[in-house]
Amino acid sequence: IAKALGLAVLASGGIYAAQRGVVDTFVQTTDASIVDFLGAVALAVLAFKGFTTITNSGGEIENPRKNVGRAIVISIAICIFIYLLVAAAVGTNLSIQEIVAARDYALAEAAKPAFGQYGLWITVGFAIIATVSGVIASVFAVSRMLAMLTDMELVPHSHFGMPGNIQKHTLVYTIVLAMTLTIFFDLSRIASLGVIFYLLMDIAIHWGVLNYLRKEISANRFILLTAITLDLIVLIAFIVVKVKADSIVIWTSLAGLFLIITAEKLYLSRKRK
């Protein structure tokens, strides 16, 4: 709540002190190709990944059949409102070149006319809150999911002498993996890797539901096929952009996929024996 309100206040201040109209901001034209645009959409998809934390916590939600879907719709609506507000604030005060130069501090720069130098400190403060809360939520959600997969004997597990239950172990593994990524990659590359793995995971889940669970859960075939198609379009465009701009991301993704698929196949084949 504090994160959303903070961003809304900063963005509102930026719009209040806008140097040009909000409507003009959203109708500006650029030289970007459709592939570049779709590549940017891929990163935007990652911005909405947080709602999967809700599904991963479904077992702890009261009346999950009703409230999980409702919570997802509400969270996406709030995100769209905040993101559009931030985009309007930044776009009405900064040029494309200024946005690129400001990078992570673009909102602070946009809010400067209204808040001055305090806008920077406010942005840093809310960025810390957003990062900490987001990391904690994601880490616990992922560790919970890994613990469930471990209980189902779908992924290997070793406690390495650690005390506690499986979820505490997977929590440690998740944090160690995240720390390893931050050592070898900057935030931009980590986000790019996240986009590729997330879209591939999304495609795999939709494909699995379409072929194995559609009748059991009464899933809509058209919606599943549409989701797979859109995911593929955005993923291919993002890969094309990254091949030209930062091929290390692609090679790292391929290596990661190879290791995961190989390890999982070996583990499952041994379990069957």
Across the structure, where does each feature detected by a protein language model lie?
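Helix-loop-helix connectors at the membrane interface of multi-pass transporters/channels
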Residues: 1, 6, 61-64, 73-78, ...
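Transmembrane helix-loop boundary segments of multi-pass membrane transporters
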Residues: 1, 122-129, 180-204, 217-222, ...
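Membrane-helix boundary/coupling elements in multi-pass transport proteins
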Residues: 48, 55-60, 119-157, 182, ...
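Membrane-interface loop-to-helix entry segments
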Residues: 1-20, 31-32, 72-73, 195-204, ...
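TM-loop-TM module centered on a large, flexible mid-protein loop between adjacent transmembrane helices
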Residues: 73-136, 154-187
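A generic transmembrane alpha-helix motif of multi-pass inner-membrane proteins
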Residues: 12, 197, 211-214, 219-273
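Helix-loop-helix junctions that connect adjacent transmembrane segments
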Residues: 1-120
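Hydrophobic core segments of alpha-helical transmembrane domains in multi-pass membrane transport
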Residues: 4-15, 86, 127-128, 174-183, ...
